[in-house]
């Protein structure tokens, strides 16, 4: 068939079937991935037993490395959600930055809160804050809502312990701590881009606000609102941030210490280093965070109530664990069948950098079926066996490329598209795309450019021509949207 090796033919058929099942049938992504893995193995020349062994090995191996972390992460997120810690962060950041900077405060809140809390739930919890501020401070609800959603969405797609990035880290075999720290850095500029776009929306739709007040009335309403929020029974800012900041600090300390002692064998076996390494492991830091959040944020909750909150969090992670494991199964089959190695040999001769493969695959899957988590897991499961065979590829940046690609053009098949637009009362399709499809694409473009630039600096396989893909696609979509909405 077109002179292609059998394993590559198996991969192509598997990808086609996967896309068809997810897009055109009611088959869930988990089952679709298992079917695709089976096809890739059987058509690619593996026996039935070899295929099944590869699937089970890949499934178990992937969940073995990140399953515990996902479970602990969603437990912590559940406690932060029900305790009011997310609201406390929002009110505190708003007070710190002051009036007229609420969009930045909400974006920062989203940036932090979405690390442990699922993005849809976080927006539902925090949107009333944006709505109240718009009503009491003559701020555009579009600006505040989009800024909040943008901060939430970017870190949700790029920073562990959110399940998607965790799964990607496991599939690429990169350190979760490194993924967390790199993801937080990479997420910064896309969030800034969304906030600037959100501020532009105020000029685009100036009549979206409610009543008009004098400056004195605005100040009184704003001060009164902040004061009323401060009287609400919420945990302190320090306690609200502690479960999120603690893992970051411990992981950072471990990374710095390892950097200094990695070439000293005696230091690596010393008791102090072992303690730092133990406390900086993602499983340990998240377990500590869950314990701290339970005893500091839910001090009055009884045993049964606390257990209920934690179990509710775990329920949300079930299907994500299955999809992540299925992605690992598909990746294992591609490695064992030889498809990854053979495709790597073909790609090595193409005029593109390997780092673009997970970015492009994630972008396409996101556009086709809408789920950012499925997009990045699919991209990682397909591309990681390929990139592992190409010398010099920075797998950490490849993992980030897969997560950034999953931000592309959120629209009708993206659940957050409907959450954001429905809660803001936007029913016109063109306006819905302006409000959410465009900012997610801006974040995608900035994120993709950031990864490519980082690869030019820290990798050895990059090219400035890699920038053409995100730049041209982003410019084309923005130009099209501008034409469609020039009369709105």
UniProtKB/Swiss-Prot annotation:
Species this protein is from: Haemophilus influenzae (strain ATCC 51907 / DSM 11121 / KW20 / Rd)
Membrane-spanning parts: 2-22, 27-47, 59-79, 106-126, 176-196, 241-261, 275-295, 314-334, 347-367, 368-388, 438-458, 461-481
PANTHER family: GNT FAMILY GLUCONATE TRANSPORTER, PERMEASE
Keywords: Cell inner membrane, Cell membrane, Membrane, Transmembrane, Transmembrane helix, Transport
Molecular function GO terms recorded: gluconate transmembrane transporter activity
The name this protein goes by in its record: Uncharacterized permease HI_1015
One of the Pfam families matching this protein, by short name: GntP_permease
GO cellular component assignments: plasma membrane
